[in-house]
């Protein structure tokens, strides 16, 4: 079987990967979390574009699927963990104990393996999507460096554990995927998008962590409401 490596979608995926590598360098070697944020954002754009291009061009291959997973591990696993490590050290944490935040990489790998095998994620995500997790930490790093803000070092470790568990949680998280563009059936998506765009327009990057936390909270509340309404089977 002949494998095509350099298709246009695969080139976009490689751009995603390289953007993630740049984010790691900015976070760990240059200690520039503002540039690291932009690199993660660019990686997320390429991550969207490669899938869009593959569907548009009807180019799908096993190579593309595997390459996408490998790129995501760097851009949305290693890069945010590197940013979190830099935050931990910058706020007074010990360099060696800061290794604990890289639990995020391990759980990102578990999340990827689960996503690749779980067929229930066509219309919604099961657990927190990796790009959302990555953008949360990237934007927090950007804000903290730009405003010279500080936090207890232990907060970085706690955050890494909480978000690691969210990555592999069984909680359905709504996806911004539209089967149609009618408001009926897409109420939550349109309302969330509208509020998010307003907040981004007003507060730019500073709004991102709150938007992502709101996304998580709304998804959890939605899950609990659904579970409360589901019929209980009596013995």
Annotate each PLM feature.
Residues 1-51, 200, 222, 232-235:
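Topogenic membrane-insertion module of multi-pass membrane proteins
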Residues 2-11, 65-70, 122-129, 175-186:
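Short, amphipathic, aromatic/basic-enriched membrane-interface segments that mark the entry/exit
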Residues 9-15, 56-113:
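Multi-pass membrane catalytic core of lipid/isoprenoid biosynthesis enzymes
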Residues 12-15, 36-43, 100-107, 133, ...:
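Hydrophobic alpha-helical transmembrane segments of polytopic
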Residues 21-24, 42, 46, 80, ...:
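Alpha-helical transmembrane segments of polytopic integral membrane proteins
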Residues 22-39, 78-102, 139-156, 201-206:
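Helix-coil boundary and interhelical linker segments in multi-pass alpha-helical membrane proteins
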Residues 50-61, 107-123, 168-177, 220-227:
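C-terminal ends of transmembrane helices
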Residues 126-235:
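C-terminal membrane-associated helical module and adjoining short loops/tails
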């Amino acid at each position: 079987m002949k494998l095509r490596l350099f298709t246009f979608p695969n080139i976009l995926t490689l751009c995603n990967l390289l953007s993630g590598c740049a984010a790691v360098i900015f976070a760990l070697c240059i200690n520039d979390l503002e540039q690291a944020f932009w690199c993660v954002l660019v990686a997320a754009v390429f991550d969207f574009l490669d899938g869009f291009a593959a569907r548009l061009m009807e180019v799908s291959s096993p190579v593309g699927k595997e390459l996408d997973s490998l790129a995501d591990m760097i851009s949305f696993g290693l890069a945010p963990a590197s940013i979190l490590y830099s935050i931990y050290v910058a706020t007074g944490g010990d360099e060696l104990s800061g290794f604990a935040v890289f639990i995020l990489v391990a759980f990102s790998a578990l999340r990827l393996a689960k996503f690749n095998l779980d067929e229930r994620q066509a219309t919604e995500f099961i657990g927190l999507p990796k790009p959302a997790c990555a953008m949360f930490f990237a934007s927090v790093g950007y804000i903290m460096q730009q405003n010279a803000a500080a936090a207890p070092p232990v907060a970085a470790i706690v955050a890494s554990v909480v978000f690691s568990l969210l990555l592999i949680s069984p909680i359905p998280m709504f996806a911004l995927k539209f089967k149609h563009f009618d408001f009926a059936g897409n109420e939550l998506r349109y309302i969330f998008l509208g509020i998010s765009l307003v907040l981004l327009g007003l507060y730019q990057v500073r709004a991102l962590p709150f938007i992502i936390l709101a996304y998580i909270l709304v998804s959890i509340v939605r899950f609990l409401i659904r579970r409360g309404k589901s019929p209980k089977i009596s013995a």
